[in-house]
Amino acid sequence: MRLRLFTLFPAILGTLLALLGPTLPAIAADASAPLVTVDGTRFVDSHGREVVLRGFNVSGEVKLAEKGKLPFADAADARTSALAMRDLTNANTVRFLLSWDAAEPAPGTIDTAYLGKVAEQAGVFADLGFEVLFDFHQDLFSRYLFNTGSWYTGDGAPKWLVQAGGYPQESCGVCVNWGQNITQNAAVQQATYDLWHNRTLTTAAGAISERDEFLRYAKQVLLYLRANLTATRFAHVLGIDPYNEPYAGNYDSGQDSRTWERDVLWPFYQTFRSLMDNAGWADRPAFVEPNMFWNGNVQNQAGGFLDTGAIGPRYVFNTHFYDQAAISGVLMWGKASDGQESDDFARIRDRSAALSAPAIVTEFGHPLSGYTSDKAPSVDKAMYQGLDSRLTGAQWWGSVATSGPVLSGTQWQWDIYSGRHHELMNDNPDKVQTTGDAWNGEDFSAVALDDSGAAYLRQDARLLDRIYPAAVAGRTLAFVYEDRSRDGDSPMAWMPVPSSLPNVQTTVSSSRYAVLVWRSGGDGAATEVKLPAGFRNTIASDVAYTISADGRTLSLSGAGATGVVHYALITDATAPSAAALTAAKNELAGWAAAAF
C-alpha cells in the first residue's frame, strides 16, 4: 500500500494521522521508554549503569536490489542472522540500514509494504535483546546516477529524483577505489550538492524540493516505525542516524568543510531533530555524523562539529573510521602493530568530551579479500584496541589513569549472504555480482553461511567474540582486552603484563585477558561484562561475582558504597592456586589504588 506524501502537510500530528487513516495507526500511549538513554558523554540504562554498545551493521544487502533493498529476504533469515550474531559474537547492538529508493518509489509515494518488512526484520533483533539504531543510508547518492556499463554503483536516492535532476554522464576518471567518486565524479558531486541546496525538481507529481522531500520521507518512516513496532520492540530502538557519510558534493565560493558543516549540515540536523520530536521520537537521540572526511588519515577535511558547542543529550556524536592508508596498499607497508589506530580513536573521544555527548563509531573495518586483505587481522585488532582504550598496549599498565572511556561501535558489516549474491549491477543482466558484498568490489562481511545454511565467522573468533563491559555500575575508569587474535597462525599479543606485577603475570600466563577498573555507583545492580564462548573465566576481583549459566556474562556485584574503586581481572588461563590468585589480587589492588 502506498501513501502520497506531498499532499499531507498537517499542522499537528493528530491531523496527519486522521488524514492517513488506518494505514498509520495512532501511536500507542503505553509505548515503552528507551532501555538505553544519554547521560553526559555516556550511554546509560534504567539502573544508571554505563552502557557500551557493540555489534555490526545489517547490512550492505540494503544497497542491493536482489532482496528488495532490505537486509534480509524475510524474517526467518533475519532471525538466522540475529541468532548467529548473538551466539558467535555476544554483540548487543545493530545498525539497521534503510533505503530511500525502496521507501519512496514514486514522488510523494511511501511503500508501506517495504516499511512493514523493515519493522518486522528489525523487530526480530529487538526480540532477541539487541539495541537497534536505524540508519538513513546512502553512498554516492544513488545507484541511478550510474549507467549500466559503469565500473561503479551507488545507493540512496530514488530513480525518479535522479531522472528529474538531469545529471551529466557519470565518470570517475582514473579511480582505483569507489570512494573516489565522492570527490571526482561530477554527477555524484552535483546531485549531492543539489540535495543540500534544496533544488526544486519538476516531477510527475509536480514541483518537489529535494531536501524537503527527504525530510518528508524520513518523517513518514519514523511515524510508521513508531506506530508499527510494539512497545517492547520500540524500547530497544536507540535512535536515528539521519544521513550516512555526509559530504557537500561541491563547496560554494568562500566555503570550506568547516563552514559547510556549521552552516548547512548542522542546521539540517536541527531540522531533523524537530522532525523526530514531531514524529514521536522525542525521547531518542539523533546519532549525527560530521562531514565524512573529518578524521580521514589520508584525505582529511576539517570538521567534527567544531562550532556547535555542546550537543548532548539530544544528539550523539556518530562517526566512522576506516584506515585509508592501510586500504590504499601503498601508503602503509606491512601489518598494523600495537597502537596503530589509538590516536585516531583518541581524537573521537576528545570530540565527544568537547561536545558533551556520547560517541559511537558506527562503521569501521578492513577488506577481507583483495590486495590489502592480508592487513585485515592486524588492522581490525588495532581498531578494537582503539575502541577499548585510548592507550597503546605498551602504555596501558603504566598510564592507566588516562585510558579514557570505552567507545561503542558497530563493525561494517554482517551479511549472511556474503559470497552468495545474485545482484545485477546497475540492473545489467550481463554484470551479475556474486562474490563478497556484491557492491563496488567490497568484501567486509564478518559472517557467511556454509552449504548447510549454518552461519560461520569469516574472521578470527578471538577478534570478534570479545570481552567488553556491557553495563558498568558506576563509572568506567579503564578497560583493556588482550584478545590474542591471530594473523594466520600467529597470535598477536600487544598487551604484556609488566614485571612489576609478577603474580598477575603468572595468573595471566599466555592467555587472553581483560582488566576492568571502575568507580562504583548506580542503584545496586551488578556490573555486567560480556564473555567469549568457551572462556575459562579465571577471575581476580575485589567484589563478589557470578557467571551466567551459558558462560557468556560475568556479573560483578554492585552492592556496597558508591565512589569506591573496584577492579576485575578476567583471564582464559587455567585457574592457579588460591594463594597465587590472592597474591594477584593484592597486586591489582595496590596498582589500582596507586593509579586512581
Q: Where is each model-derived feature located?
A:
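Secretory targeting and sorting signals
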Residues: 2-28
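Hydrophobic anchor at the start of a short beta-strand
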Residues: 132, 359, 409
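Aromatic-rich peripheral "rim/lid" segments of glycoside hydrolase catalytic domains that contact
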Residues: 306-311, 318, 371-543, 556-596
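Short capping micro-motif at the N-terminus of alpha-helices
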Residues: 53-54, 547-550, 556
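Extracellular glycoside hydrolase catalytic/binding regions
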Residues: 35, 74, 202-405
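Active-site mouth of glycoside hydrolases
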Residues: 33, 38-39, 43-44, 50-53, ...
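Extracellular/luminal ectodomains and secreted, surface-exposed scaffolds of diverse proteins
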Residues: 36, 542-552
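Signal peptide processing junction and immediate N-terminal pro/mature segment
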Residues: 22-28, 218, 287, 408, ...
